[in-house]
Curated annotation (Swiss-Prot):
Disulfide bonds join 34-107. Belongs to the YebF family. Its main location: secreted. Keywords: Disulfide bond, Secreted, Signal. This is Protein YebF. Residues 30-117 form the YebF/Cmi domain. One of its GO terms (cellular component) is extracellular region. InterPro entries: Uncharacterised_YebF (IPR020236), YebF/Cmi_sf (IPR038703), YebF/ColM_immunity (IPR025603). Residues 117-136 are annotated as: Disordered. It is found in: Secreted. The gene is yebF. Pfam families: YebF (PF13995). Residues 1-23 form the signal peptide.
Length: 136
C-alpha cells in the first residue's frame, strides 16, 4: 500500500514538472510599417513590442509566466526573413515558467502575428519536501 501511494505521489510530481505543449490561436496586431529592417532590428522591434504592448494586455500569459515583466530573448541567427516578412522565435521566462512564441512580422502590411507554441512550468520547490525534516 505504501509503495502504491509513493508511486502516485512521484507520478504527480513528475507530471507537474513536465510542461504542457500546445499551440494557441494566433493573435494578430497592427504595427507601424518597418520596411528595410535587418535581423538585429527585427529582433529589437519584436522584443520591444512584446514587452511594451503585448504582455501588459495578455492576462493569461502573465498568469502563466507568473510575472508582468518576463525576461525575453530572441536569437538573431534563428530569425528567417524574405521580402520584409520575418519569422521570429521568441522565448519569455517568468517566475512560474517559460513560454515560446513564433512571431511573424509582416513589415509590408504592418502586422505582427504571435502564436504561443508551448509553455513549460517549473515545479514548486516546496512540493515533495519532507515536512518532518528540520534544520540540523
Amino acid at each position: 500500500m505504501k509503495k502504491t501511494g509513493l508511486a502516485l505521489v512521484l507520478a504527480t510530481i513528475l507530471l507537474g514538472m513536465m510542461g504542457s505543449v500546445h499551440a494557441q490561436e494566433p493573435r494578430v496586431v497592427k504595427v507601424p510599417a518597418c520596411i528595410g529592417l535587418n535581423q538585429s532590428q527585427v529582433a529589437t522591434q519584436v522584443k520591444r513590442d512584446f514587452l511594451q504592448n503585448r504582455i501588459p494586455r495578455w492576462e493569461a500569459d502573465k498568469k502563466q509566466l507568473g510575472t508582468d515583466k518576463p525576461v525575453v530573448w530572441i536569437n538573431v541567427v534563428d530569425i528567417i526573413g524574405k521580402d520584409d516578412i520575418w519569422q521570429v522565435p521568441l522565448i519569455a521566462r517568468g517566475n512560474k515558467g517559460d513560454k515560446t512564441y513564433q512571431v511573424v512580422l509582416d513589415c509590408k502590411s504592418g502586422t505582427m502575428t504571435y502564436t504561443g507554441l508551448n509553455a513549460q512550468t517549473r515545479p514548486d520547490p516546496q512540493i515533495g519536501l519532507n515536512s518532518q525534516a528540520g534544520p540540523k
